[in-house]
């Protein structure tokens, strides 16, 4: 409409580009612009506690006798605070920055840049669409479909670059690099089908698991965090009667009743391959709410790492930590190994747990995966038990992805993402019980406060009796494949 009005006024209104105006007009003076955006954006970028304090301060200024012109000197945060506030955003941003750097390095070595190579640049630009990297009142980072689109372009751009450098049958690598620029090294492992990124300092966990053929990051799960506006959520879907909203930034509506019951906050980041030692009285509801007894010190603590690259790529992560057994602290060693080959269609995972003390101990061990799927509501998406003769076939259809449930013991467990046409299957040699529940956040959007599906938590767990000089071992294969017709 705006451009239409410009065209209608072309007989008296002359338009020009900034470049043309600068060439024909002298500057009025010099100015250095501050690193600012509009007032609300600078408030949203602050940490939760600081955001509430800032909101209180600005309200006091507005209600005070101070001249309102003074308010412009009160400033909130800095946009890049979003990258510190949300590690998932930072990881996404640093990944695409790294890919962009590698792309330009590759292009600088070419005498002629082909249309195919130029198309990679478009994917890189698309992956930098800003709305998925931050959050205010418009959903943003909390909207999974926005992050899915970013990851699809990001993974595709990287995959296309790899095909320029490596023949499909030759790609296999392990690397130690500080991807997220936090001064700690991550470990990367991959082939033409999968990318796996580990954080040794955060429980030896998997930060990113990519299935390259479809451009899917299965680790695209957002951790449940407290937001400054959570204390303003009304009890009913009706608009709050506290005050009339003056703008969309002040909306006080709730899209459904009972949202406060979903205000569960995680004390650790929702990654995968997290190693739990549960209190004997832990229930699935306590675990869902992240208010349970964690007896070990493995979840967010550092692991030592070793990797090898030969016919296959292997990464071994291990930690000797402590587990509370009743009123005593017992030393336990956890070692986990992941491996892939050049042509591997799956990822091999193995665990070895050994007691370091000379006494029998009983522990409840769990291995946690947090995985993102296209939808929790779609009927085409569900849990299932794979057929023993063909893992692509469903032997038993289980519940949908919105349910909280316990299954098992089972050797194999599958998640069908019918909207994507993909099955993710985990097969264990040691039958495991499984807790499953959706990871859902409560966030603000232009339509009001809402619940958003971020992914599913799968906890494979075993009750073990560990004896001196013995070990418990379990092997797993994780694979992603197109859904069988």
Predicted features, each with a name:
Residues 1-185, 194, 419-422, 427-432, ...:
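Active-site and substrate-binding clefts of carbohydrate-active enzymes
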Residues 12-19, 197, 349-350, 364-366:
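A structural signal for short, well-ordered beta-strand segments and their strand-loop junctions
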Residues 22-26, 132-134, 142, 196, ...:
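Flexible loop/turn segments at secondary-structure boundaries
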Residues 124, 193, 351, 469:
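Hydrophobic, well-ordered secondary-structure elements that form the walls
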Residues 192-306, 311, 320-322:
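Acidic-aromatic substrate-binding/catalytic surfaces of carbohydrate-active enzymes
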Residues 203, 208-232, 329-334, 341-388, ...:
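Acidic (Asp/Glu-rich), glycine- and aromatic
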Residues 287-335, 343-350, 357, 411-485:
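Beta-strand-rich recognition/accessory modules
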Residues 360-364, 370-437:
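Active-site/ligand-binding surface loops and adjacent short beta/alpha elements
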């Amino acid at each position: 409409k705006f451009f239409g009005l410009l065209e209608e006024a072309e007989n008296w209104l002359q338009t020009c580009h900034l470049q043309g105006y600068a060439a024909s007009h002298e500057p009025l003076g010099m100015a250095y612009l501050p690193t600012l955006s509009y007032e609300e954006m600078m408030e949203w970028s602050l940490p939760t506690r600081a955001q509430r304090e800032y909101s209180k301060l600005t309200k006091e200024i507005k209600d005070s006798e101070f001249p309102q012109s003074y308010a412009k000197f009160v400033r909130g945060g800095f946009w890049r605070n979003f990258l510190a506030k949300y590690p998932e955003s930072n990881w996404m941003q640093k990944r695409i920055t790294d890919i962009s750097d590698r792309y330009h390095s590759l292009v600088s070595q070419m005498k002629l840049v082909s249309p195919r190579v130029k198309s990679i640049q478009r994917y890189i630009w698309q992956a930098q669409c800003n709305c998925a990297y931050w959050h205010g009142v418009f959903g943003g980072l909390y909207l999974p479909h926005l992050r899915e689109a970013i990851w699809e372009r990001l993974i595709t751009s990287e995959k296309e670059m790899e095909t320029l450098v490596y023949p499909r049958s030759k790609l296999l690598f392990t690397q130690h690099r500080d991807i997220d620029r936090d001064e700690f090294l991550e470990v990367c492992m991959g082939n033409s089908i999968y990318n796996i990124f580990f954080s040794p300092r955060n429980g030896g966990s998997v930060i990113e698991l990519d299935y390259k053929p479809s451009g899917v990051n299965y680790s695209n799960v957002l951790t449940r965090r407290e937001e400054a506006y959570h204390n303003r959520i009304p009890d009913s879907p009706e608009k709050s009667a506290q005050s009339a909203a003056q703008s969309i930034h002040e909306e006080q509506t709730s899209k459904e009743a009972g949202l406060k019951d979903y205000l569960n906050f995680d004390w650790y980041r929702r990654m995968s391959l997290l190693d739990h030692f549960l209190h004997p009285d832990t229930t699935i509801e306590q675990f869902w709410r992240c208010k349970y007894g964690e007896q070990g010190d493995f979840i967010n603590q550092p692991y030592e790492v070793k990797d090898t690259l030969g016919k296959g790529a292997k990464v071994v992560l291990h930690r000797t930590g402590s587990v509370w057994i009743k009123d005593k602290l017992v030393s336990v060693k956890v070692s986990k190994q992941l491996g892939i080959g050049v042509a591997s269609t799956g990822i091999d995972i193995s665990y070895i747990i050994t007691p370091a003390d000379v006494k029998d101990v009983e522990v409840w061990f769990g291995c946690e995966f947090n995985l993102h799927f296209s939808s929790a509501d779609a009927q085409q998406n569900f849990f299932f038990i794979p057929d023993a003769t063909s893992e692509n076939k469903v032997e038993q259809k289980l519940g949908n992805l919105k349910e909280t449930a316990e299954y098992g013991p089972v050797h194999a467990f599958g998640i069908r993402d019918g909207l994507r046409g993909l099955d993710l299957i985990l097969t264990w040699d040691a039958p495991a019980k499984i807790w499953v529940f959706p990871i859902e956040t409560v966030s603000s959007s232009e339509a009001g406060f809402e619940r958003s599906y971020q992914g599913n938590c799968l906890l494979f767990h075993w009750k073990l009796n560990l004896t001196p000089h013995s070990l418990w071992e379990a092997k797993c294969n994780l694979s992603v494949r197109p859904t069988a017709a």
